[in-house]
Amino acid sequence: MKLTASDIHVELGGNEILKGIDAAIKEKEFVGIIGPNGSGKSTLLRQLKTSLQPVGQRSGRILYYGRDLEEVSQYTQSAKIGFVFQNPDTQIVTDKVWHELAFGLESIGMPQDMIRVRVAEMASYFGIQNWFYQSTDTLSGGQKQLLNLASVMVMHPKVLLLDEPVSQLDPIAAADFMATIHKLHAEFGITVIMAEHSLEEVAAYVDEVIFMKEGRLIAVRTHTRFVYFPA
């Protein structure tokens, strides 16, 4: 097990959002976290990267490759735990596509020659050479979300977290994005954890599904088993 959550409780603004979550995710798995609005799926996803944990009362423990996540440096978390947000505009911080690809590597102090190599590799892999020098504000929603994904993958993460990444895309862009995630998972062997409203969005790709309701884990489904956890 490479990511383990033990008895996670989170309280925000006096409301208990997560109520004793226990979960274990194996390396290289593709896991879907499914639940309606208010189920706690996005809050759970954010617990897996300390810089994104919302301010509030929290208890429990998360292990990342056997280490308490609180003890894993921000440098390591920035490089090895990638996150793609629901809103394509939320993540973009620069005005040019090429700079957006380079920004994360610059922030961790990578030498410029290595940055150029990595950026060129990812631009080619994602097929964005034709808009490499464009302004980010001229991109479509699908292009922005693809750029966000490429900007995460240029860091060579071990874990990729996605918070409803296709909910604001049109059906064609959403299908293309999901196909790209599937390709990344298959070719790079990264661990993928995606929060979504509907099982339909991820059913064709996932190894395991975690179902949530009202801050609790209510069931887990894999290809070979279904386990229900009564309240």
Locate the predicted segments by residue:
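H-loop/switch region of ABC-family ATPase nucleotide-binding domains
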Residues: 196-197
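Conserved catalytic motifs of ABC-family nucleotide-binding domains
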Residues: 156
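Conserved ABC ATPase signature
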Residues: 135-139
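Catalytic Walker B motif of ABC-type/P-loop ATPase nucleotide-binding domains
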Residues: 160-163
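Conserved ABC ATPase "signature" region
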Residues: 113-131
